[in-house]
Structure formats: structure tokens, C-alpha cells
Curated annotation (Swiss-Prot):
It comes from Mesoplasma florum (strain ATCC 33453 / NBRC 100688 / NCTC 11704 / L1). GO terms for molecular function: ATP binding; glutamate-tRNA ligase activity; tRNA binding; zinc ion binding. The lineage of its organism: Bacteria, Bacillati, Mycoplasmatota, Mollicutes, Entomoplasmatales. Its EC number is 6.1.1.17. A motif ('KMSKS' region) lies at residues 253-257. Keywords: Aminoacyl-tRNA synthetase, ATP-binding, Cytoplasm, Ligase, Nucleotide-binding, Protein biosynthesis. It is found in: Cytoplasm. Pfam families: Anticodon_2 (PF19269), tRNA-synt_1c (PF00749). This is Glutamate--tRNA ligase.
């Protein structure tokens, strides 16, 4: 059987985001499931739009996610596969475009930009919606072509589209039919001698012996042009599969303008998401394994991958689900792993950790291990431990709704003031004693104590919070609500 070789081919015109991560990840799973090769190729022919640092960012974030390339320009494969950056293959594209001219599958187009615009405007005026090239230069005589060349007239190279019906067997969408009459003769080499996307991608996929092309459905319209190029050269066509769109909560295509969803992988990295959780969630966008299990390791996903289980319907990016999956991975970390990871995200300008002991800081951080959705959220919980916090008017109003809260706070203050051995078990016993002495329990007991001791109505284990705040800070906080 032919070896499975799949590729992810980003353009360095932007940074790694959810959409192209899904493409890379699915190609990776597909290749690894069949013990094949996963290739990362750079499509950098759009020189004016290339963004500095984008290539480095792509590789850095792919590696962070665990989507590791078997081949790339950093790790080339066999010499026969050619270069892994399109900007290093201009000669190859030009040579093959000229070959198509020699076998009458392409021709030089000498039309100027102004002539083309006029032609398209005339078509629109006639009510033609899907405008296309008229084919004017395909009818030039040899002498006319020679004359234009001698005059050094600029030309592009256009593919001569044959009249045919293409039946494409898409392994996700099923059979798709195209009438080539709708395409028009398209440019494969621009006047600046740079190959267009549809031509370069076919040459690259052929050179690299790509067996399957798995990509987003926005590329479906490119597929007939690419297949025609394969056929013109007499090359074997890879299998094509087009994944459904990823949409946001409003049903629009996910983009950097989508409301509550982060778009770029770097944003998730900076907020303290775990790469394993990101890998897990993104793998479930438009694809599903057999069974109900949602938390899956990379190795499990490789083993379970099935190219017949892609969805034909759009997949909604659910930020709540993303956070939930990450929280499960956070909970699964060992205490040592959790502490090492979370400390990287503490805002040290807001919270002076150097003034505190390592043991105390560890205990504070561990209070929130089961509560964090992502590591940066730790900063939402540290204020009461590091800084002076005023009790909000909203919190005071909550306190007022609890009958006889004053007596609970007074008794709590009395017991705290006389507590000599500051230990968690002693604090638990103290709270129990306050309950016995006031006859209060449940919310009527714990809410006044929590607000009085921590200036907040929310938090983890009450005794742990009181212990870590320390006696002096607790007494100072009580004074704020008396």
C-alpha cells in the first residue's frame, strides 16, 4: 500500500489560530494513525503579505501543542520531495508551466490589467454574475505570440481548461460534480513569474507524494482547478477531503472578531491553557470518535482516528466546553505539576510573592486547584491574601440579609482573639464552637464568618482560608464589617 503522506501548508501571512490548528491536527492524526508522514510546508509566495515572525510562530505553537512535523524546511525528507518553502521553488514552477505550454495545456496571456477589467465590466453589464476570462489569448496565432515576445510584452501563463465534467469523490462530503465551463482559463504563473496558489500547491503535493489532501471546505472551489492540473500532467491525483466550517456561537465563521472566543493559539498559551487540553478539544471540532468519552490523550486520538467520522455540518466552537476540558486537565495534574505551571501566570506586579514563604504560597495556590479553568485565573483569587481589600457595598448588603449576623461575627472575633495555636484543626474546632454558642449553622453561620474574615462572600475551604490569611489579617478584616 502507498505510504500515507499528509501535509499542513500554512502561509506566513498570519499566526496559528483555531482554524488552521484544526487542519494541522487532523492531518497529523490521519498520518500517525496509518504510520504515515506528517509534513509542514510553507506557502510563502505572497511576498507582500508575509508577516515577519509568522513562520517561527507557526512552528513554535505547533510544537507546543504536540503537533510535530516529520518533515519541514527545518527537517527535510528525501531530496526527491523538493524544497519545503515555495519561495525556494520558483524555478520548478516556471519550468512546469512552460512544459504545459509545450504540450498545449496552457498559453501565454498578454492581456493588461486594464483590458481584463474592461472585459469583466462588460460581462457584468450583460448580467453575467460568475465572470471569467474570455480566452482571447488562447486564440492568438504563432506570429502574434512571437511579435508580443519580441516586444517584451508582459505575460502571465493561463491553464487551458478543457470542456469536461469532474466527479470528485470527497471522502468527507461525498461525490461533488463540477462543470469545467464555469471555471474559465485561470492563471498559473503571474506576470512577475510567481506561481499562483492552485498551481504551486499541485506541484508541491506531487513532488512530496502527498496521498491525502485534508483541508477546510473553503477550498472546495479550488479542487476542480487542481485536479485539472493533475490530469494535464498525467499525475496521480491524491484523495481529497474537505472539513466543515468552524463557527462561533452566532453561527458565523470563527474569526478574530468572534465575541467570546479567543482565536489565536498564542492567546490560549498566554492565559494558561494546557497544550494537551487544546489538542483534545480541537480534535473534536467536526470529528468525533466512537463512544461517549470526551477526555482523550494524543495517543488515544491517534489510535481511535477514523476518516469516516468527520461531520458534514458546521462545528460550533464552544468556549465554555474548551474551558471545561482544560479545567479537567488542570485537576489531573499532580500538585507539583500544578504549582510549577500556575506560578508562571501569577501577576507579580499585583502580588508580591517574594515577601511570602514558598510553603505558604504553595498552600494558597493549592486551594484553587479544583476551581481554575485556566492558570491565569489564579490572579482572580489572590487579592485577599496579598493586599488590603475593602468590603464592597454588595457584600455588605448580602451580610445584612442574614439574621443576627452581628452575634456570629462578635462570637467569631472573641474566639479568634483567644486562639493561641494557629492550626487548621483548631480553626475548624473554633467554627464549631461559634455554632454551638450562637445556635447558628449552614449559611447563617458560614457566610458571616467568611465575609468577616476574608472580606468576600466566595472562596474555597473556609478554615484553610482563615489559616492562610493569618490571625492579624483576619482580625483586621473583622474590624471592617463591625
Amino acid at each position: 500500500m502507498t505510504k500515507f503522506r499528509l501535509r499542513y501548508a500554512p502561509s506566513p501571512t498570519g499566526f496559528l489560530h483555531i482554524g488552521n490548528t484544526r487542519t494541522a491536527l487532523m492531518n497529523y492524526l490521519f498520518a500517525k494513525h496509518y504510520n504515515g508522514d506528517f509534513i509542514v510546508r510553507i506557502e510563502d509566495t505572497d511576498l507582500e503579505r508575509n508577516v515577519e515572525g509568522a513562520i517561527e510562530s507557526q512552528f513554535e505553537n505547533l510544537n507546543w501543542l504536540g503537533i510535530n512535523a516529520d518533515e519541514s524546511f527545518l527537517k527535510p525528507g528525501e531530496e526527491k520531495y523538493g524544497k519545503y518553502m515555495q519561495s525556494q521553488k520558483f524555478g520548478r514552477y516556471q519550468e512546469l508551466a512552460e512544459k504545459l505550454i509545450s504540450i498545449k495545456k496552457a498559453y501565454r496571456c498578454f492581456c493588461t490589467t486594464e483590458e481584463l477589467e474592461k472585459d469583466y465590466e462588460d460581462q457584468v453589464a450583460k448580467g453575467i454574475v460568475a465572470t471569467k476570462y474570455s480566452g482571447k489569448c488562447s486564440r492568438l496565432s504563432e506570429s502574434e505570440i512571437e511579435s508580443n515576445l519580441k516586444s517584451n510584452k508582459d505575460f502571465s501563463i493561463r491553464f487551458l481548461v478543457p470542456e469536461t465534467t469532474l466527479n470528485i469523490k470527497d471522502f468527507i462530503k461525498g461525490e461533488i460534480t463540477f462543470d469545467s465551463k464555469e471555471l474559465g482559463d485561470f492563471v498559473i504563473l503571474k506576470t512577475n513569474k510567481i506561481a499562483t496558489y492552485n498551481f504551486a500547491v499541485v506541484v508541491d503535493d506531487f513532488d512530496m507524494e502527498i496521498s491525502h489532501v485534508l483541508r477546510g471546505e473553503e477550498h472546495i472551489s479550488n479542487t476542480p482547478r487542481q485536479i485539472l492540473i493533475y490530469q494535464a500532467f498525467g499525475w496521480e491525483t491524491p484523495q481529497f477531503g474537505h472539513m466543515s466550517l468552524i463557527v462561533d456561537s452566532t453561527g458565523k465563521k470563527l474569526s478574530k472578531r468572534s465575541g467570546n472566543a479567543l482565536f489565536f493559539i498564542e492567546q490560549y498559551k498566554n492565559q494558561g491553557y494546557l497544550p494537551e487540553a487544546m489538542f483534545n478539544y480541537i480534535s473534536l471540532l467536526g470529528w468525533s470518535p466512537i463512544g461517549e468519552k470526551e477526555l482523550l490523550t494524543k495517543q488515544e486520538l491517534i489510535s481511535m482516528f477514523d476518516d469516516k467520522r468527520f461531520s458534514k455540518s458546521p462545528s460550533t466552537f464552544d468556549m465554555t466546553k474548551m474551558k471545561w476540558i482544560n479545567s479537567q486537565y488542570m485537576k489531573a495534574l499532580s500538585e507539583e505539576e500544578y504549582l510549577e505551571f500556575t506560578k508562571k501566570y501569577i501577576n507579580t506586579e499585583m502580588f508580591n510573592t517574594k515577601e511570602k514563604s514558598e510553603d505558604w504560597l504553595n498552600q494558597v495556590l493549592l486551594l484553587f486547584k479544583k476551581e481554575l479553568e485556566f492558570a491565569d485565573q489564579i490572579n482572580n483569587h489572590l487579592n485577599i491574601f496579598f493586599n488590603e481589600v475593602d468590603v464592597t457595598s454588595e457584600t455588605i448588603e448580602i451580610l445584612k440579609t442574614i439574621e443576627e449576623h452581628e452575634s456570629v461575627i462578635k462570637e467569631f472575633e472573641t474566639q479568634i482573639s483567644t486562639l493561641n495555636e494557629w492550626e487548621i484543626e483548631n480553626i475548624k474546632s473554633l467554627i464549631k464552637l461559634v455554632s454551638e454558642n450562637t445556635g447558628k449553622k449552614g449559611k447563617d453561620l458560614f457566610m458571616p464568618i467568611r465575609i468577616a474574615s476574608s472580606s468576600s462572600e466566595h472562596g474555597p475551604s473556609l478554615a484553610d482560608v482563615i489559616y492562610l490569611l493569618g490571625k492579624d489579617k483576619v482580625l483586621a478584616n473583622i474590624a471592617k464589617v463591625k
